[in-house]
Every structure is written in structure tokens, then in C-alpha cells.
Amino acid sequence: MKNKYHIFFTGMLSIAFFMGATVDTKAQDSIAVVSRVNIEHLKAMPDLQLSNTLQGQAAGLIVIPNTGGIGYANSTFYVRGQHSNGTNKAIVIIDGIERPIDDILPEEIESIEVLKDASAKILYGAQATNGVILVRTKRGQAGKRVIRFGAEYGVQPVTRLPEYLDSYNYATLFNEACVNDGLLPLYSDADLQGYRNSTGVNDLLHPNVDYYKEFLRSSSTFRKATLELSGGNARAKYAVTVGYTGSSGLEKVGDRSDLNRVNARGNLDIRITDFLSASADVAARVEKKDWGAKDGGGMFSEISTLRPNEYP
């Protein structure tokens, strides 16, 4: 059993001056090519990897999921495909800082915008040549107090597992391959008849084993709980989000892979004078991963190499 702990902490303190008025550019007045994501759709998806839930949520955004298993690296983002021999990945900016999007929860997010054209490079430099996924987290609103709690538990059924030959068909085709190579068949007629009438896993002489069925479950489980607090007045506004997420893998035999993660975020805005304001954003994440019997997709790779008549 291998445990891996991650502790992620970021903090930011910024002071800005305002000259009594602000300008809010509407989407239809902007010259940038922007797609916006519906945050409520992301919250409804039973996937603990936030990056995976962005697939199909914005025009022109391509999401390539990581196939390593629960708790692995973020999905890869491409805007308008891969168009050069170099890196084509879009970058993720969260509240002005480049960070992995899976570091946060959907409940922390106010908006997600995908910048697709040259305006992204103007704003964020050469690293944004391939597009920017711009994430803004929630902030408190004066006179509007919010207390929200949510809890989820569910199962994620396997879409499809590979189907392999049973022992009888495997032995029959193996004999044909031997004959085609000018060799004698490996399995006798008695063996073939034994495999045809095999009682399955417990047949000592002629086993017929579906290793995917024996080693893997038909579904994994996930669990999630979040608490949101926000509010404030004309002088100070706050927004706090605390969340727990967890997931268990498909392993039926041996140690089961497991992920437990706690996220916490606090955003504070203070109006010091009519011309001076300060904001502080703090985010933390503590994560425990148990890789189980095999790391990532290693179990799938090994099961696929086992013959159905190899072990009783």
C-alpha cells in the first residue's frame, strides 16, 4: 500500500486604487473571442476531476482526460485543436495566477471563460498563445448573506470492459495457429472438450477464468460534501468555501485505490476609504491518495495479458 500526501497552499494580498468609477465591458462589446461555461452544469456532473467535466462545455475547447485513475494529473486542454509541432496546450489562470484547475471545486467558481484569440496573448503573454481558460472564484456581496450546504454519494458504473475469448475458443484458435506454423496442436481433443464443459474458475484441470470479472468491480463510488458562506456590508465582504471529496476505485482483489481530499478557500475584500481597497485570497488543499494494489492502469495492463486457462 502506498500513501501519497499533498499539501497545497497559496495566498495573495493585493491593494488597488479606484478613482470613483469602474467600467464593465459587456460580452457583446468585447473584441475577444470568448466562450463561457455554465457552472451549474459542472456541479451536476458525477466526476471529482473538475478538468474532466469541461468536455463539451465550451465551443472550441478540447479536453483530453488523463487515464491514470482517480487523483491523477489534470486533463489536457486544447483550444481549436493542435496546430503546431510545439506545445499546443491552453493555460489555466485562476484569480490571476496560473494553477491547475483540479486544485479547486466547482462550488468555489463564479465564472469560467475560454479566451481563444490574440487578445489572450496580449493579456497574458507568449504562454497564452494557445488560449487561456480564465477562472474567477466567488466573492462576497454586500447585504447578501449566503449559507449553503450540499452532500452527494453515488456510484459510477463502468462504461465497458474489454471482452476476451473463453478458454475453449482460445485453445481452439491457438491450435489453429500452431498448425499454420507447421507445429503440432498444443491442446488435445480431450482438453478442448474439457474447456467446453469447464465449470469456470474452480475447475482445476480445465479452468475458464474471466479475469476482469474476478479482479474488478462493475462500478466505483464517489462522495462529496461542501459548505459555502458569504456575505458582507459596504466596508467588508467575504466568501468562504470548504469541501470534502472522495472516491474509491474498481479493485475487487487486494488493496482498493482511494482518494480523500479537503479544499478550503477564503476571499476577503475590504474598502478602506473611497479611494483605497484591499483584497486577500487564501486557498489550501490537503489530499491523501492510496494507489491500491497497482499504480494507475497497471492492473488493467496485467489482466489483459492473462490467458483464460492460465490459472484455476
Predicted regions: what they are:
Residues 78-85, 303-304, 309-311:
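Short linear motifs in intrinsically disordered
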Residues 158-167, 252-254, 279-281, 286-310:
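Outer-membrane beta-barrel and related beta-rich outer-membrane complex signature
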Residues 1-265, 272, 277-279:
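Short, small/polar-rich motifs associated with maturation and membrane association
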